[in-house]
């Protein structure tokens, strides 16, 4: 479902809000039908705050990495035009980032790690499937080499978040790390590729 909704939202309907909200509604529907909503206790800290907070903030390194490697990636100029076409302009970027920060990490961790994940210490297929749907967004704009790099990084991230959940018996630290990564990456895209001066 994520693959279809993201593709339909971005490349057929051409609306980023439709894509992300449709994706989230799909997660809510599937998790509800499966009866897989985690209990509130799963979001209680599994470690002390002085461990959880620094670990969570480490996710910001994702944005730093994107900023540093963006010149090397040499994304197609069409990416900036597509962002505008998808409805991401000066008026909508900040609400989009806030929505993504507050909603996306929680739903993705519930869907990909809690419901479809496992306590296996080895990589599993779900880690790769989670990484793969991101490539739908990027495939038209970056080279195959960088698509492979992104795929490996995201697969590794999915695996790492599962291990944190397994060791801590809590979803909090991995979700906050995910949140920091999402926000930092979106802020970099907004500041470097976003149409800051579009009305």
Map each language-model feature to its residues.
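Juxtamembrane helix-loop-helix connectors linking adjacent transmembrane helices
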Residues: 40-104, 195-199
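Alpha-helical transmembrane segments in multi-pass membrane proteins
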Residues: 1-40
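Juxtamembrane "helix-exit" motif on the non-cytosolic side of transmembrane helices
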Residues: 8-14, 68-77, 135-141
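Alpha-helical transmembrane segments
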Residues: 1-9, 55-63, 125-129
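Transmembrane helix-loop-helix hairpins at the membrane interface
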Residues: 93-199
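Cytoplasmic-side transmembrane-helix entry/capping segments in multi-pass membrane proteins
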Residues: 23, 47-57, 116-124
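Non-cytosolic membrane-interface motifs at loop->transmembrane helix junctions
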Residues: 18-23, 80-88, 144-152
């Amino acid at each position: 479902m994520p693959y279809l909704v993201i593709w339909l939202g971005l490349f057929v309907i051409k609306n980023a809000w439709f894509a992300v909200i449709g994706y989230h509604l799909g997660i809510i529907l599937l998790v509800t039908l499966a009866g897989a909503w985690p209990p509130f206790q799963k979001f209680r800290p599994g470690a002390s705050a002085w461990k959880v907070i620094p670990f969570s903030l480490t996710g910001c390194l994702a944005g730093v990495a994107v900023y540093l490697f963006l010149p090397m990636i040499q994304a197609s100029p069409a990416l900036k035009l597509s962002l505008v076409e998808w409805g991401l302009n000066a008026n909508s970027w900040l609400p989009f980032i806030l929505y993504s920060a507050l909603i996306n990490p929680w739903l993705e961790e519930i869907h990909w790690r809690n419901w479809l994940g496992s306590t296996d210490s080895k990589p599993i297929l779900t880690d790769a499937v989670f990484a793969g749907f991101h490539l739908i967004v990027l495939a038209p704009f970056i080279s195959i080499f960088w698509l492979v790099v992104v795929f490996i990084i995201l697969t590794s991230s999915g695996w790492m978040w599962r291990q944190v959940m397994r060791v801590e018996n809590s979803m909090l630290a991995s979700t906050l790390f995910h949140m920091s990564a999402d926000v930092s990456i979106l802020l970099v895209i907004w500041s470097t590729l976003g149409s800051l001066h579009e009305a």
